[in-house]
UniProtKB/Swiss-Prot annotation:
It catalyses: an R-cob(III)alamin(out) + ATP + H2O = an R-cob(III)alamin(in) + ADP + phosphate + H(+). Part of the ABC transporter complex BtuCDF involved in vitamin B12 import. Responsible for energy coupling to the transport system. It is a peripheral membrane protein. Pfam families: ABC_tran. Its main location: membrane. Keywords: ATP-binding, Cell inner membrane, Cell membrane, Membrane, Nucleotide-binding, Translocase, Transport. GO terms for cellular component: plasma membrane. Residues 1-236 form the ABC transporter domain. It is found in: Cell inner membrane. The keyword tRNA processing does not apply. This is Vitamin B12 import ATP-binding protein BtuD.
Length: 253
């Protein structure tokens, strides 16, 4: 992980995000953690080029604002927490929206991704008929399909806002495997979440946000300190070691 993919320099959004500076390296899995309202979604939307911001964001040494929306769609995929859809649109048609018109020989990758998330029987189902977990798996399949390296050589970055929402434990495990594979192929993932144990176990680097400010940035062991987490989340958070592993628990009065 020696190649810089993205650089953020004093990025801010009025009343939502304080000036923030950070680097994203190719192949990294970065988790953004922090309380509700700390700026996680705002930061991801800025990095996706969706939300106006002050400061500078460079993607592959080029200012993010210099990319057209079509160019950005080739380089990065963004999963927001909520998205409206056309209820009668079948799943297979929704997934096709994530593919560039010039791409060919995508069937193998589509089949592999659908198998990961067990979507085969839903391909002809209208998205409006899906459960919350099924819809989340469809959306995840779409963003992976958009930047999967074997069919999109320009695909580099996945920005995922709370991607584990509505997923059960086996689906989270499948997502983790797919993220790991994407990073091994040279992709980079920046995602937000609320599961401290999951982030401690899976992240290469953690950005800890509080009140719109980046209060810590580093490896999980460097960032996830009991006093720091307790202060940020305004709760008594303890590390509970079990053999060689660590588990984070919140103790409420």
């Amino acid at each position: 992980m020696t190649n810089q993919l993205m650089a953020l320099n004093q990025v801010s959004v009025r009343n939502r995000l304080m000036p923030l500076t950070a680097l994203v390296q190719q192949g990294e899995q970065i988790h953004i953690i922090g309380p509700n309202g700390s700026g996680k979604s705002t930061l991801l939307a800025c990095m996706a080029g969706i939300l106006p911001y002050s400061g500078a964001i460079d993607l592959q040494q080029k200012c993010l604002s210099q990319y057209s929306h079509c160019q950005l769609a080739r380089y990065r995929a963004w999963l927001s927490q909520q998205i409206s859809s056309v209820p009668i649109m079948p799943v297979f048609q929704y997934l096709q929206l994530h593919l560039a018109a010039h791409l060919v020989n995508c069937d193998g990758v589509l089949s592999e991704l659908c198998s990961f998330f067990k979507l085969g029987k839903f391909l002809e189902t209208p998205v409006g008929n899906l459960s919350g977990g099924e819809w989340q798996r469809v959306r995840l399949t779409g963003v992976f399909l958009q930047v999967w390296p074997s069919i999109n050589l320009e695909g580099k970055l996945l920005l995922l806002d709370e991607p584990t929402n509505n997923l059960d434990i086996t689906q989270v495990a499948a997502l983790d495997l797919l993220i790991k594979k994407f990073c091994e192929l040279g992709g980079t993932v920046v995602m937000s979440g609320h599961d401290l144990n999951h982030s401690y176990d899976k992240a290469d680097r953690i950005w800890l946000l509080a009140d719109g400010s980046l209060v810590a940035n580093g490896k999980p062991d460097e960032v996830m300190k009991e006093n720091t987490l307790s202060r940020v989340f305004a709760a008594d958070i303890k590390c509970v070691p079990e053999k060689t592993d660590k588990y984070w628990r919140v103790f409420l009065p």
